[in-house]
C-alpha cells in the first residue's frame, strides 16, 4: 500500500526526463506506480531482474541528479514532502499543534517549505517528533528506505565475523531481521534457516533469491551477488566473499521465511541452536523485549551473534544529523550501546558474554574534524577534553544462553 502511494507521488513529482527513464524499465505499463509496487511485492525471477535494472537506474540518479533520486531524510530532495505528509497523518493532534507553533505555519505544505529552508527547525522536528516514531511507523518507512539499496546492511559484519563460525555449526539458525537475505543464503549452505523481517519488500527479495539459488538460476542470481559485492565497496575485499558460483554449486538446506516483528517470534521455546541479528537492534522500538524473545526461543548453550552501533557511533550520528538537519534519526538508528550496556541487557535475560569486539574504527582526528562542523559547540568542547587514539563506531558481540 505505502509503496504504491509513494510511487504515485514520486512519478507525478519528478521531471520529464527522469520519468522517461523509469518508463523505459516498464514500457508496457499503463499504471506505472501500480506496476512498480507490484514488482516490489513479488518474489519471482522476473521481479528480481527488474529490481537489478531499477537499482542500476537509481544509483545513476543519485550521482547525476540527486535532487530527483529516491532518497530518505534529505530536505532538498524531491521525496521530502512525501515523508512530511506521511508523518503529518500519523502523529497526534498535540504533536501537530507543536509543529504549527514552532513553524509559525498552519498548513502542511507551508510547514514543509519552512522545514526545507530552516536548519534549526528541522533539528527541532527531529528531536521533538521524528525521534519518537512508533514501531509500526518505522516498519512502514523501511518499505521505502528499502528502495535505496538492494542489500540491507550487515553483510560486511556477517562475512567478517559470523561466516567463519557458521561453517562449523549445525542445527537451526534464526536470521532475525534478515533484510534482503544475503546471510540467509550463505547460512543455508550449512544450516536450516528461519528468516524473519518486518519489511515486506526486503523479505520478498530474500525469498526470490533463495528460490533462484535452489533452482541453480545462472543468469540473474550472479548479477545480484555482484551488486551486493559492489554495494559493499572496499569492505568486500576485507573479508571472505562467497561467489555466486559457490552458492549455486552448494546444497542448500531448508529455508523458511516469515513476515513479522522479532519481538514476537512464532516459535516454540528452545527451538534454535543459534541466532544471527546484525544491524537490526538499533532500529527496534524495544531492544530488551527482543533479547527476552531470543532467550525464549534459543536452546541452552545456543549463541546469539549481534552487532550494534556504539556511543561514539551515536555521537557521530548526532553530529551529522545536526549538520544536515535531518527530520528523522540518521539511518533510523533509535538506540546505541556501549559494551557494558549491551552485555548488561543480555545478562539480565539469561545470557553470558562470549566476546565483544569493537570494529569500524575512526581516528580521533577524523572524529574531531566531523565534530567541528556541528552546531553543538558544547559537544565539541566535551570531546576535546577527553581525547582517544581512535574510536569504534560499532560492536560485534557473541552471547551464550546459560
Task: Name each model feature, range by range.
Residues 2-264, 291, 321, 392-395:
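Conserved N-terminal segment of class I S-adenosyl-L-methionine
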Residues 276:
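A conserved beta-strand element that flanks and buttresses the S-adenosyl-L-methionine
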Residues 279-280:
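Short catalytic micro-motifs in class I SAM-dependent methyltransferases
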Residues 288-300:
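A short glycine-rich, Lys/Arg-flanked "PGG" loop and its adjoining helix->strand segment in the class I
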Residues 305-327:
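Conserved class I S-adenosyl-L-methionine
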Residues 325-341:
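Acceptor-substrate binding/catalytic loop of class I
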Residues 354-378, 390:
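Conserved catalytic loop of SAM-dependent methyltransferase domains
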Residues 373-402:
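Core SAM-dependent methyltransferase catalytic element
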